[in-house]
């Protein structure tokens, strides 16, 4: 009886593993559709290196990578916005944008909305410029790491000295 459950579990793992080979993330098919539309598979696309991949490879720490990824995602959102009226690729862009929301924003709609609002501010708008300068000092203060407030460690030599003398 015990062995049958092991065999069934093993078979389940094999079936699920083989299904994983045939399943792709939804964005892969849609990205291929966009590649066709933009002729991104042509050999001249590789001229002068990559736009984003070398940058992502350079930065290994999670915080640094998040900063770079946010700029890259901002670029893609702007690109998709420029082609939002194009019916032939609209589904692909929406699928990829939705997948970015899941992967980058952890499906947090408010976080994505705030991100998009930030990327949509026009730097040529006088009112936006004035507000940005007005908030600059507070923004700079937020960028600074918060001072660490914690307990000081006691010197262990004090305790070691007592043990040695006893």
Swiss-Prot record:
SUPFAM superfamilies, alphabetized: 4-helical cytokines (SSF47266)
GO biological processes: adaptive immune response; defense response to virus; humoral immune response
Residues making up the signal peptide according to the UniProt record: 1-23
Listed GO CC annotations: extracellular space
Keyword list, A-Z: Antiviral defense, Cytokine, Glycoprotein, Growth regulation, Pyrrolidone carboxylic acid, Secreted, Signal
A GO term for molecular function: cytokine activity
Modified residues (Pyrrolidone carboxylic acid): 24
Superkingdom of source: Eukaryota
Tissues of expression: Released primarily from activated T lymphocytes.
Signal is among the record's keywords: yes
Subcellular location: Secreted
Positions annotated with a glycan in the UniProt record: 48, 86, 120
InterPro entries named in the record: 4_helix_cytokine-like_core (IPR009079), Interferon_gamma (IPR002069)
UniProt family annotation: Belongs to the type II (or gamma) interferon family.
Assembly: Homodimer. Interacts with IFNGR1 (via extracellular domain); this interaction promotes IFNGR1 dimerization.
Role: Type II interferon produced by immune cells such as T-cells and NK cells that plays crucial roles in antimicrobial, antiviral, and antitumor responses by activating effector immune cells and enhancing antigen presentation. Primarily signals through the JAK-STAT pathway after interaction with its receptor IFNGR1 to affect gene regulation. Upon IFNG binding, IFNGR1 intracellular domain opens out to allow association of downstream signaling components JAK2, JAK1 and STAT1, leading to STAT1 activation, nuclear translocation and transcription of IFNG-regulated genes.
Protein name as catalogued: Interferon gamma
Organism, scientific name: Saimiri sciureus (Common squirrel monkey)
Name of the encoding gene: IFNG
């Amino acid at each position: 009886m015990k062995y049958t459950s092991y065999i069934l579990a093993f078979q389940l793992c094999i079936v699920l593993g083989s299904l994983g080979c045939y399943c792709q993330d939804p964005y892969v098919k849609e990205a291929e559709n966009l590649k066709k539309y933009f002729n991104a598979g042509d050999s001249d696309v590789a001229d002068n290196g990559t736009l984003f991949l070398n940058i992502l490879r350079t930065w290994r720490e999670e915080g640094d990578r998040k900063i770079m990824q946010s700029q890259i995602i901002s670029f893609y959102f702007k690109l998709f916005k420029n082609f939002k009226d194009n019916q032939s690729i609209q589904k692909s862009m929406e699928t990829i944008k939705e997948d970015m929301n899941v992967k980058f924003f952890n499906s947090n709609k408010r976080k994505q909305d705030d991100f998009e609002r930030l990327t949509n501010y026009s730097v040529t708008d006088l009112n936006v410029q004035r507000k940005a300068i007005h908030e600059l000092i507070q923004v700079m203060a937020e960028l600074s790491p918060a001072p660490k407030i914690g307990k000081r460690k006691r010197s262990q030599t004090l305790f070691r000295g007592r043990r040695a003398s006893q």
